[in-house]
């Protein structure tokens, strides 16, 4: 077969994977608010009102995703479609609604471009929450890891950024759910009775912030009622 035909067929097959527009999967729980969600308007509010900054980029929206076994390396990952962040892969609004097993690994990837005004500032990458354990790469360099499905975390990614052009983020996630003794609420692989569907992967807002070289990272109020 002509090489040009093979290339055309391969390109057509790849385009079909990402050609389908995002839409919710299933119809188990649908509220009036869920019906209004789109990749363009998903969770646009600043995620940390206690310490709000003017210069920030919301990374919620469509990311590429793939589910592999845990032995699959990054270089062998083939992305199979798009997932709407920040919804867990098991959820309807993710657009995927797949069962995620403790032996699986969930991969995310997306690109972003920084505003030129951020050039002389530090850039911090924030995750509201990722369930349960994850690794994060920026421009193919490992930035860090995090373990725990309910708490926010962040990385200063300044030294990993390119001087210009698109930047790439990749996240790999594993979730033992009820196969290990971890904080998981009522999540269980076998949903029955009082148990409910697991929540795996990115399930809170992901965002970038431009900060000065010296900046306030956290505020911890301390009160003393006796002094009043």
Predicted regions: what is each one?
Residues 1-7:
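Bacterial N-terminal signal peptides that target proteins for export
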Residues 8-16:
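Bacterial N-terminal signal peptides
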Residues 20-56:
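N-terminal pre-domain segments of enzymes
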Residues 33, 46, 83-85, 216-221:
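Short clusters of hydrophobic/aromatic residues that line enzyme substrate/ligand-binding pockets
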Residues 61-86:
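Predominantly extracellular/luminal regions of secreted and cell-surface proteins
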Residues 64-68, 88, 98-218:
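Accessory beta-strand-rich segments of carbohydrate-active enzymes
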Residues 80, 95-96, 100:
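Histidine-centered catalytic/metal-coordination loop motif
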Residues 223-228:
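Short, solvent-exposed loop/linker segments at the N-terminal edge
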